[in-house]
């Protein structure tokens, strides 16, 4: 199905099932411990062996010798897999570094061996006996040190210029010129990376934890140099990903190599301390913002430049993209700079680009509003735009940023805010309020599905879409139930299997909208088949209460299956609407913090997010996404930072004892409001994504609240005690 014109009225608009706050249909499986994750397919692997990864102890250089003799002789050990005995390997298109290193070492803890044994404990013990010898090369590990060496943008991301920024900024009545930094961050998903591989002749089945089934399958086949049709990926349940499981990782490749070597199933899991250095992370940024406004507060010039680092062949953190679209302004400049760093691979983490970009932009906007003497909410409203500032002919399909800010200000009690920093106290606590705009583009990907009408009247949905804790099972079932007029309980959904039609997968906030659109497309075809089977006109038929009705005639759905189950397979492909219209999602984030006047401890007291993100397919699962994102934004603002050893090139705090994330005691009262934002330009579902929007802007709102509480402007995240303590006002 080609979606190339705005959606008209369709069966989804009935909103009998879609748009309702249904509980997650996979909830009972997860709460009873019967949902099986990648490492838990025990019945399929009664004789499984276990692999333990040995990682490089240097960040850059060469492996000069690898002695595995002692490990090989240890109890229970089967083979030790290394680059020298693994056979010829390629590299997946979406991998920056090779997943099995040697002799060249590209980053710290790049896998150099896998010890395979009868038990996990034997494999782990034997891994400590592997002796590696290296020749260490000098590496680059500090973005600040490498910044000056990077003066040109990457070839495929040139600077963007509109109007005359330099002239407009020079003559601006009010201006801000400041630098902001965000640190390297880790995904820290609850479930670690894990895989189990089984070969049957030349056919590989891999149970793994991966967000994008088709990407994983394609890159694994390429790396192993086997036909893609010989690889099957199964990933029905995923314990969080946040972008860290978008791509093929070393656990999957090494499990496949080991299983081929021992001719039996092999399980490989990355222990928590291995994940930050062995996999990917959100790269640090150094961002320079210059914004100018006229006497009335209208922005006349805006420049956002961002530096980030990555391994050779890697991509930059696109932290400037929201600054191209969020606010009006005739004169604009954005640019990315990419330094070569020898740290582990930088790649996507929840809301790549916008999340760190808004951490800087939305502080700068507050600073400029203060200089202009305008309330920060009103300043954002004053500078709203309904068109792409770089192309006045291109309008937003829907843009309710003003409504988000107005609704949020009223609900939050913004009018009671004291605009003078450091003036509100609650005992020993300084109290402040902050606001930030949220923005995330609406990305679209082709997505397919297969839908069966069974002879007993139930409906089965099959797609390789994944559920990373987001509620995919439920919203896909709601879509099929709405389209075919059956109760939600009569729909079974099967996900995460490469034998199913290729979906958009889970990433980039595109999963909900595009995967449900794929199911919609398959159901449109199935409706036609059902109508034809019972002799009805498909165009004049309605589906409700388990029946198909055409005028005065009706039939029970399962009557259409007299000749056996009916199956429809279809995909949704998006046309030029995304080029004709700018499609984005918007939010207003409001935060109250308390800062202890003596210790500098920051406590977030309450949070409010008002979101405009298309039709909300399930308010309950969508709210869960947003409050989780708000919590992640709190972590980014106040505690999360991968500490870099810039002598040896690795992340020091590579476990959850050293890398702090918010816990239940940190989470305050959280409220979420969804505006009616049904968007016929986005898809037949008229929906968009919301799981990343809930993060975008939160950290800056907290930073702005800390400033309002204390008068201390922190531009370097995270906002830790050391950045506040010696600047706090005297305790009275």
Curated annotation (Swiss-Prot):
<feature type="binding site">
    <location>
        <begin position="688"/>
        <end position="691"/>
    </location>
    <ligand>
        <name>Mo-molybdopterin cytosine dinucleotide</name>
    </ligand>
</feature>
<dbReference type="InterPro" id="IPR016208">
    <property type="entry name" value="Ald_Oxase/xanthine_DH-like"/>
</dbReference>
<keyword id="KW-0479">Metal-binding</keyword>
<feature type="binding site">
    <location>
        <begin position="615"/>
        <end position="621"/>
    </location>
    <ligand>
        <name>Mo-molybdopterin cytosine dinucleotide</name>
    </ligand>
</feature>
<dbReference type="GO" id="GO:0047770">
    <property type="term" value="F:carboxylate reductase activity"/>
</dbReference>
<dbReference type="InterPro" id="IPR000674">
    <property type="entry name" value="Ald_Oxase/Xan_DH_a/b"/>
</dbReference>
<comment type="similarity">
    <text>Belongs to the xanthine dehydrogenase family.</text>
</comment>
<feature type="binding site">
    <location>
        <begin position="468"/>
        <end position="470"/>
    </location>
    <ligand>
        <name>Mo-molybdopterin cytosine dinucleotide</name>
    </ligand>
</feature>
<keyword id="KW-0500">Molybdenum</keyword>
<comment type="function">
    <text>Oxidizes aldehydes to the corresponding carboxylic acids with a preference for aromatic aldehydes. It might play a role in the detoxification of aldehydes to avoid cell damage.</text>
</comment>
<dbReference type="InterPro" id="IPR049648">
    <property type="entry name" value="PaoC-like"/>
</dbReference>
<comment type="subunit">
    <text>Heterotrimer composed of PaoA, PaoB and PaoC.</text>
</comment>
<keyword id="KW-0560">Oxidoreductase</keyword>
<feature type="binding site">
    <location>
        <position position="625"/>
    </location>
    <ligand>
        <name>Mo-molybdopterin cytosine dinucleotide</name>
    </ligand>
</feature>
<dbReference type="Pfam" id="PF02738">
    <property type="entry name" value="MoCoBD_1"/>
</dbReference>
<dbReference type="Pfam" id="PF20256">
    <property type="entry name" value="MoCoBD_2"/>
</dbReference>
<dbReference type="InterPro" id="IPR036856">
    <property type="entry name" value="Ald_Oxase/Xan_DH_a/b_sf"/>
</dbReference>
<dbReference type="Pfam" id="PF01315">
    <property type="entry name" value="Ald_Xan_dh_C"/>
</dbReference>
<dbReference type="InterPro" id="IPR046867">
    <property type="entry name" value="AldOxase/xan_DH_MoCoBD2"/>
</dbReference>
<dbReference type="InterPro" id="IPR037165">
    <property type="entry name" value="AldOxase/xan_DH_Mopterin-bd_sf"/>
</dbReference>
<dbReference type="InterPro" id="IPR008274">
    <property type="entry name" value="AldOxase/xan_DH_MoCoBD1"/>
</dbReference>
<keyword id="KW-0574">Periplasm</keyword>
<feature type="binding site">
    <location>
        <begin position="511"/>
        <end position="512"/>
    </location>
    <ligand>
        <name>Mo-molybdopterin cytosine dinucleotide</name>
    </ligand>
</feature>
<dbReference type="GO" id="GO:0005506">
    <property type="term" value="F:iron ion binding"/>
</dbReference>
<feature type="active site" description="Proton acceptor">
    <location>
        <position position="692"/>
    </location>
</feature>
<dbReference type="GO" id="GO:0042597">
    <property type="term" value="C:periplasmic space"/>
</dbReference>
<feature type="binding site">
    <location>
        <begin position="241"/>
        <end position="242"/>
    </location>
    <ligand>
        <name>Mo-molybdopterin cytosine dinucleotide</name>
    </ligand>
</feature>
<protein>
    <recommendedName>
        <fullName>Aldehyde oxidoreductase molybdenum-binding subunit PaoC</fullName>
        <ecNumber>1.2.99.6</ecNumber>
    </recommendedName>
</protein>
């Amino acid at each position: 199905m080609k979606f190339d014109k705005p959606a008209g009225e369709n069966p989804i608009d009935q909103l009998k099932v879609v748009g309702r706050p249904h509980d997650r249909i996979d909830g009972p499986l997860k709460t009873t411990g019967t949902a099986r994750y990648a490492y838990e397919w025990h019945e399929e692997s009664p004789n499984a062996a276990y692999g333990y990864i040995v990682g490089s102890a240097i960040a850059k250089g060469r492996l000069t010798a690898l002695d595995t003799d002692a490990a090989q002789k240890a109890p229970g050990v089967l083979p030790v897999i290394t680059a020298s005995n693994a056979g010829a390997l390629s590299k997946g298109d979406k991998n920056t570094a090779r997943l099995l290193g040697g002799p060249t070492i590209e980053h710290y803890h790049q896998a150099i061996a896998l010890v395979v044994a009868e038990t996990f404990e034997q494999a782990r013990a034997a891994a400590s006996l592997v002796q590696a010898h290296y020749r260490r090369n000098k590496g680059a590990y500090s973005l600040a040190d490498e910044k000056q060496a990077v003066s040109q943008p990457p070839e495929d991301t040139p600077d963007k210029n509109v109007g005359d920024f330099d002239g407009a900024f020079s003559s601006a009545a009010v201006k801000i010129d400041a630098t902001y930094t965000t640190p390297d961050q880790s995904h820290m998903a609850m479930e670690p990376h894990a895989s189990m591989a089984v070969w049957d002749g030349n056919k590989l089945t891999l149970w793994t934890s991966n967000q994008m089934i088709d990407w994983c399958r394609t890159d694994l086949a390429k790396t192993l140099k086997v036909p893609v049709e010989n690889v099957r990926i199964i990933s029905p349940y995923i314990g969080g990903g946040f972008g860290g499981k978008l791509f093929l990782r070393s656990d999957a490749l090494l499990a496949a190599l080991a299983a081929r070597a021992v001719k039996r199933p092999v399980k490989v899991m990355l222990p928590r301390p291995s994940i930050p250095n062995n996999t990917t992370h959100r790269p640090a940024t150094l961002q320079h913002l210059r914004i100018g406004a006229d006497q009335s507060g209208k922005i006349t010039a805006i420049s956002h430049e961002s530096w980030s680092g990555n391994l050779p062949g890697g991509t930059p953190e696109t932290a400037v993209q929201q600054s191209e679209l969020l606010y009006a302004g005739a004169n604009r400049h954005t640019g990315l700079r990419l330094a070569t760093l020898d740290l582990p691979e930088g790649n996507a983490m929840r809301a790549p680009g916008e999340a760190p970009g808004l951490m800087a932009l939305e502080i700068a906007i507050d600073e400029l509003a203060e200089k202009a003497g305008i309330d920060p909410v009103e300043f954002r409203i004053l500078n709203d735009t309904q068109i792409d500032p770089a192309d006045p002919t291109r309008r937003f399909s829907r843009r309710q940023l003003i409504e988000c800010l107005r609704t949020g200000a009223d609900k939050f009690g913004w009018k009671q805010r004291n605009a003078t920093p450091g003036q509100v106290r609650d005992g020993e606590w300084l109290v402040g309020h902050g606001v930030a705009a949220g923005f995330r583009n609406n990305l679209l990907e082709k997505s397919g599905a297969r839908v069966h009408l069974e002879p007993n009247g139930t409906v089965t949905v099959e797609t390789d879409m994944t559920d990373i804790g987001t509620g995919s099972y439920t919203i896909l079932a709601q879509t099929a139930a709405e389209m075919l007029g059956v109760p939600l309980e009569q729909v079974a959904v099967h996900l995460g299997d490469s034998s199913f039609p290729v979906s958009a997968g889970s990433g980039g906030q595109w999963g909900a909208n595009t995967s449900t659109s794929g199911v919609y497309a398959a159901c449109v075809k199935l409706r036609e088949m059902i109508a034809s089977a019972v002799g009805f006109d498909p165009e004049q038929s309605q589906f409700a209460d388990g029946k198909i009705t055409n005028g005065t005639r009706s039939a029970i759905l399962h009557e259409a299956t007299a000749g056996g189950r009916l199956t429809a397979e279809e995909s949704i492909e998006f046309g030029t609407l995304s080029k004709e219209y700018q499609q984005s999602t918007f939010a207003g984030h409001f935060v109250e913090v308390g800062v202890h006047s003596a210790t500098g401890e920051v406590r977030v007291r309450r949070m409010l997010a008002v979101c405009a993100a298309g039709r909300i397919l399930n308010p309950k699962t969508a709210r869960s996404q947003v409050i989780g994102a708000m919590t992640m934004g709190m972590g980014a603002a106040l505690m999360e930072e991968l500490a870099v050893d810039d002598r040896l090139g690795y992340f020091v705090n590579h476990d959850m004892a050293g890398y702090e994330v918010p816990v239940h005691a940190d989470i305050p009262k959280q409220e979420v409001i969804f505006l009616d934002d049904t968007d016929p330009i986005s898809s037949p579902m008229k929906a968009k994504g919301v799981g990343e929007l809930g993060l975008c802007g939160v950290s800056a709102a907290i930073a702005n609240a800390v400033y309002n509480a204390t008068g201390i402007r922190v531009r370097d995240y995270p906002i830790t005690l050391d950045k506040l303590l010696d600047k706090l006002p005297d305790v009275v």
